[in-house]
Design a protein with these regions (language model features):
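Helix-loop-helix connectors at the membrane interface of multi-pass transporters/channels
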Residues: 1-9, 168-186, 210-234, 265-268, ...
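Flexible loop linkers connecting adjacent transmembrane helices
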Residues: 2-6, 38-44, 71-90, 115-138, ...
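Transmembrane-helix boundary/entry motifs in multi-pass membrane transporters
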Residues: 6-13, 48-52, 82-100, 136-145, ...
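Membrane-water interface regions at transmembrane-helix termini and the short interhelical loops
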Residues: 2-8, 32-47, 67-87, 135-142, ...
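Helix-loop-helix module between adjacent transmembrane segments
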Residues: 5-16, 20-30, 63-68, 102-106, ...
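N-terminal alpha-helical transmembrane segments of multi-pass membrane transport
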Residues: 2-131
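Transmembrane alpha-helical segments of multi-pass small-molecule transport proteins
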Residues: 17-31, 56-63, 222-250, 267, ...
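Extracellular/periplasmic helix-exit of transmembrane alpha-helices
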Residues: 109-121, 272-295, 355, 359-387
Length: 655
């Protein structure tokens, strides 16, 4: 099987239909861009008129749900087994969150959006101090907690079911509490196909718009002509860099690029802060944050029902639809890098840290731009923003003393954001089309990378980017229904998980007496200080634990239970007792490695020589952090019965 997976890990019912549907949609947008824009535009217009309330309510529910999960008893549950630890340090984690979630968007809209709201507010007169305050409130609202809540709820669903319940790390797993094993059938395939389409088309359209900003920056810096030909070359160059990043893997390629770009982003922001109206910007950040928090409930539910305007369809609904359509990609990427964190830690990190940085970025760039227009009278900046949002950032930076160097830094940042979006997008789509496999052949990632590049180039040549972007946002409506159902399923699963934890701690503490029986204290002491090798633990599992599991299984089968003893995984054994319609019981034992303390072994010895192993018990919810090495057969049977008794008590309470 291992050799087969080095050749291909694709899931045919998802891979092939996704490729065909992507080709069909791209051909429609390329061959008849005007017709495509009309069809998708009418769909979006219908949604704006008839379903705007649903979008607004759904995003509010997502935010409330993730906050509730963090502050409730569910917050202590880990995204993975109870013994798991985070795969990445906090800084690396934050850097990858930032790069995948908001990168190119911040560069594109950091100056443009606040200025556009300042000049043309949804209500009231533009170009005033009131309009300036309202512009920053709106910008904070669009880029703050709500956007990250959408990403967080998708990532929570995927990480919880994928890492804690060993389900595939794909969107189909979100429906497991609602439809059970049917996620592996046509319904699950359809969900994953939809996620592949949304991710490929979303990333491709973002790349198409992002390359326009790179072209604008190069035009300002080096007089590189602006045009489709140059942008196609830029896409090919960026995708070549993305290919190199993919070849080095998540732990090196994407992580290093993300950390580098976060440092560059902080540097650029600090330079603008220092060279701009520093005191005003610091005051504005504090006031903007206070105004945002004070108005968050009102803005969350504001549909301008008593002041009808087309503004909400072009801004708030556009953003909400885009965040939702973008969430399979970003949510899955966040889930991929968040294994081992508690729900409380996860929500705090995903909601507060990126949102806090984003709001600081918007203040430094947005308020600086508004200050230039409102106080310094630099009306040309407003005209440049209205003329071309891709050039807004560079028109803004050239007003500073080191404008050329700042613009050069900005171009590098946009390029790196471009690359991280492309390679993380290819990685996510590859996982979706491979049934959740985390380790897949390089050619599959390269295939999806080429598909996204070809899609972006084709749409760019045919002027079909806007049409497909509109289609992607319109597709968020049915996907929102799916997300609401999946969120309900997650809450249902968390309630059962928390109940099981409570029952386990309320029951009698686990007795170890079964394991020691009547053995002498000398033998027990020898077992405590023994530092077994892997081979010793494996032999113990094979000679003692496996027969104990088989004895329990045989007795339960006599009583009509469906029981399995799984010895297929190397060096481990697990006993599964089926409970149709209710959670199954799992008792497993496997070797777990530790490093011997320094007072026992020399630091100079080889790494392998310094390890010792324990025969640790694993239940459905993860490792239990106790060792049964050296126990007798009857002692192991007693431990199985103790754990099974607690499981049956949990099932009784949860009914």
């Amino acid at each position: 099987m291992a050799n087969e997976r080095t050749v291909s890990t694709i899931n045919p019912p998802v891979f092939y239909p996704s490729a065909v549907l992507i080709l069909a949609l791209v051909l429609f947008a390329v061959v008849t861009p005007d017709t495509a824009q009309q069809v998708f535009g009418q769909a979006q217009a219908w949604i704006t008129v008839n379903a705007s309330w649903f979008y607004i309510l759904a995003v509010a529910l997502f935010l409330l749900s993730v906050v509730f999960m963090a502050v409730s008893r569910y917050g202590d549950i880990k995204l993975g087994p109870d013994h798991s630890e985070p795969d990445f340090a906090n800084y690396s984690w934050f850097a990858m969150l930032f790069s995948a979630g908001m990168g190119i968007g911040l560069m594109f809209f950091g100056v443009a959006e606040p200025v556009m709201h300042y000049l043309s507010p949804p209500v009231g007169e533009g170009g005033t101090a009131v309009a300036a305050r309202e512009a920053m409130k709106i910008t904070f609202f669009h880029w703050g907690l709500h956007a990250w809540a959408v990403y967080a709820v998708v990532a929570l669903i995927l990480a919880y079911f994928g890492y804690r319940h060993d389900l595939p790390l794909t969107l189909r797993s979100a429906l497991y509490p609602l439809i059970g094993e049917r996620i592996y059938g046509p319904i699950g395939h359809a969900v994953d196909i939809f996620a592949v389409l949304g991710t490929v088309l979303g990333v491709a359209t973002s790349l198409g718009f992002g390359v326009a900003q790179i072209n604008s920056g190069l035009n300002y810096l080096f007089d590189v002509p602006q045009g489709v030909g140059v942008q196609v070359i830029l896409i090919l160059a960026a995708m070549s860099l993305a290919t190199l990043s993919l070849a080095t893997g998540l732990e090196r390629g994407i992580r290093i690029l993300s950390e580098t770009n976060l440092l560059l982003a902080v540097l650029l922001m600090l330079l603008v802060l220092i060279m701009g109206p520093t005191v005003f910007l610091l005051q504005a950040y504090v006031q903007n944050t206070g105004s945002y928090l004070a108005d968050i409930v009102d803005k969350t539910f504001n549909l301008y029902a008593y002041e009808p305007t087309d503004w909400i369809g072009g801004w708030t609904l556009f953003y909400w639809g885009w965040w939702i359509a973008w969430s399979p990609f970003v949510g899955m990427f966040i889930a991929r890098i968040s294994r081992g964190r508690t729900i409380r830690e996860f929500v705090s990190g995903v909601l507060l840290v990126p949102a806090g940085f984003t709001l600081m970025w918007m203040t430094v760039f947005g308020d600086s731009a508004i200050h230039m227009i409102h106080v310094q009278g630099l009306d040309s900046l407003g005209a440049a923003v209205n003329a071309d949002t891709a050039q807004a950032l560079f028109a803004f930076l050239q007003a500073f003393p080191l404008g050329y160097l700042l613009s050069l830094l900005a171009v590098v940042m946009v390029l790196v954001f471009f690359v991280t979006s492309a390679d993380s997008g290819a990685m996510v789509v590859d996982m979706l089309a491979s049934g959740g496999h985390g380790k897949t052949p390089l050619w599959q990632k390269l295939f999806w990378s080429l598909i996204m590049a070809a899609t972006a180039i084709a749409l760019l040549l045919a002027d079909g980017l806007t049409a497909l972007q509109t289609a992607t946002i319109a597709s968020a409506l049915p996907y929102t229904l799916f997300l609401l159902a999946a969120t309900w399923g997650l809450l249902k699963a968390l309630r059962l998980d928390a109940t099981k934890r409570r029952v386990r701690f309320q029951s009698l503490s686990l007795s170890r007496a079964h394991g020691h029986g009547s053995e002498s204290w000398q033998r027990r002491l020898r077992g405590m200080v023994m530092m077994p090798r892997r081979s010793h633990v494996v032999r113990f599992i094979q000679d003692t634990v496996t027969p104990a599991c088989e004895a329990v299984a045989e007795e339960l089968r006599k009583q009509g239970f469906e029981v399995e003893v799984d010895t297929e995984r190397p060096e481990s054994v697990s006993l599964v007792i089926r409970h149709p319609g209710e959670p199954d019981f799992l008792y497993g034992v496997r070797p777990r490695a530790y490093v011997q303390p320094s007072f026992i072994v020399s630091e100079e010895e080889e790494d392998e020589a310094r390890k010792y192993f324990r025969a640790e018990v694993f239940l459905r919810e993860g490792g239990q952090d106790y060792d049964i090495m050296g126990w007798g057969r009857d002692g192991v049977i007693g431990d199985i019965l103790d754990q099974y008794e607690r499981h049956r008590h949990f099932v009784h309470v949860a009914r």
